[in-house]
Amino acid sequence: MSGYVGVVVSDPWLQSQFTQVELRTLNSKYVSVKNQNGKVTIEDLPPLFAKLKALSATFKEDEIKGMLGELGSDTSTDVSFEEFLKIYLNLLSKAAEKSGGHHKNSSSFLKACTTTLLHTIYQSEKGPFVQHINRYLGDDPFLKQFLPLDPHSNQLYELVKDGVLLCKLINVAVPGTIDERAINTKRVLNPWERNENHTLCLNSAKAVGCSVVNIGTQDLAEGRPHLVLGLISQLIKIQVLADLNLKKTPQLVELLEDSDDVEELLRLPPEKVLLKWMNFHLKKGGYKKTVSNFSADLKDAQAYAFLLNVLAPEHCDPATLDAKDPLERAELVLSHAERMNCKRYLTAEEIVEGSSTLNLAFVAQIFHERNGLNKDGKYAFAEMMTEDVETCRDERCYRLWINSLGIDSYVNNVFEDVRNGWILLEVLDKVSPSSVNWKHASKPPIKMPFRKVENCNQVIKIGKQLKFSLVNVAGNDIVQGNKKLILGLLWQLMRFHMLQLLKSLRSRTLGKEMTDADILSWANRKVRTMGRKLQIESFKDKSLSSGLFFLNLLWAVEPRVVNWNLVTKGETDDEKRLNATYIVSVARKLGCSVFLLPEDIVEVNQKMILILTASIMYWSLQRHSRESSDSSSTQSTTTTCTSTASSPAPSVTEEEEVSSLSGEVTSLAVGDAVSEITTVSEEASIE
């Protein structure tokens, strides 16, 4: 492990307000404005702060200059880095106040792809989160010795430090995500075991749709409150919104009005569907307003009163709507909900305060308990809206991968969300920096159809420059939502990204491109170095379905990560499934960011098999690169010996093995995308 410490701040409280990613970014900005004397003054700060994303949407440079002038100091006064951080926090707090406490970066759910620089998560939200944990994990065989937690104490932040609780909570949000056999669950874990749990947690959180771009394993090991609460809130949100789609709840089709299209409902994110459901019932109940958020529009509790009267008239209390005091009305609403068997998720005070996090969870809880939708023939066709299983799995994989990149947009449905081209341009900018001409791009909302086509045409143009196979593919195909073409394009993007990551670590290849054959040969050699005879001929090799090759590969790159007592022979379908589930969790525990499902291994989905193998290779080469760097910087014999002893697999020849394969050529993965896109293009031209 690296001995890197990061940016250190002498004030522990101040240090706790930022992640290392944030501190490094802010330190870089601070250093960039130093004058010739190596100093930073107050007058240097307004232009800098005005460019920071967390402040630029709220304040102009002149406003920031005025606020800094209120500090009462001479503008030529030197500002230390710690003073810079304190001033920044003060400005963030003013930004939150100006936007009514709901600054775009202050969401306690850590909305996808936003920065955590502004962590204004109300401490009161911790209580409901703790109650949620007590409710869903209270009977867990391992955690029941620590539960229930006291909502008024800091027990939560202590318990998360070993990583077990968060891993278990991920499985509550999306059952089966983590093979719990891979979680280290001894009562006392050593630092290495705790780090493995946190790594497994973060990679699994990404795999269910959480944004963790600013959270590291060390943040969880230290139990940093704002980051812990942010991650927990995302998991709770995913859990409570899981059924807000036509596939899980086909009755939702009842929400459609005559002018609405099913496609319109399909493209709505879950929270928007929940609002649509709420307004549907409010309209039936005679409520005159439209609820557009889970905060200000619910503060007076009137919408809640109307909603519950429609859903559960048998528990209606006339005093609720007659109440003049919002707090009193909120209390009566909660009593009504309890009579419906909705346990209290928030307090009357939190309704009146407008906590969007807790209100969303409460409305979702009401939906689950009693959605008030009819079960008749009207929604029967929604149940028949079945998609190809492999298409659904691929869409899920690409959606999660895109959301893990840290782009500004968030993808809810790949086939709908990429049609204006903007998200694809954001992805291209991530995987191939500076490839996008933003002057010729249109940002959503885009009203003019030709602007969408322009965006998509640029996507196709860049794809061809990157040597993607896009024969007879035009931007309009994306705008029209051609699923096969979109999947083919996304596969090439994902593969290109992985190969670029691998290429960046191969210093001995002299710029030669990485190929699929390189990855295949590396995997076979790695397994062979451990004395195993298992070898595969391609990423379509049917023997891969047993899972044994991948378990041996994982064991070869890090022997301690595989517990062979948990491995089956992989002969029956059940044994293959057990091995595949274990492989996915072990890979994530190791540090691989993978989005495939166990079924992809059992069925030998060659695309996902390639990405899994490449991810393991990337982790192995990355560790070798890091160890080589540490060894070079320390020039210590002791360190070198320790590094060698801790890595049984010979890592010295890691890059030599790979570079020796550079002459091997393959078109395995590209060919698959080529044939898929070419076939669809031909079909389109025939039609």
From Swiss-Prot:
Query: Which residue windows does the record flag with biased composition (Low complexity)?
Result: 630-652
Q: What is its main location?
A: cytoplasm
Report residue spans for region: Actin-binding 2.
Answer: 392-621
Q: Where is the Calponin-homology (CH) domain?
A: 123-240, 268-371, 392-498, 513-621
SUPFAM superfamilies hit by this protein? Calponin-homology domain, CH-domain (SSF47576), EF-hand (SSF47473)
Q: Which domain of life is it from?
A: Eukaryota
Q: Which residues form the EF-hand domain?
A: 7-55, 59-94
**Carries keyword Transport?**
no
One term under GO cellular component: cytoplasm
Q: Name one Pfam family in it.
A: CH
Enumerate the subcellular locations listed in this protein's record, separating them with semicolons.
Answer: Cytoplasm, Cytoskeleton
PROSITE patterns, per the entry: ACTININ_2 (PS00020), CH (PS50021)
Q: Quote the record's miscellaneous comment.
A: Cross-links actin with a constant of dissociation of 0.55 uM and stoichiometry of 4 molecules of F-actin for one molecule of FIM1.
Q: Which PANTHER family match?
A: FIMBRIN-1, FIMBRIN/PLASTIN
Q: Could you identify this protein by its name?
A: Fimbrin-1
The root-end lineage is:
Eukaryota, Viridiplantae, Streptophyta, Embryophyta, Tracheophyta
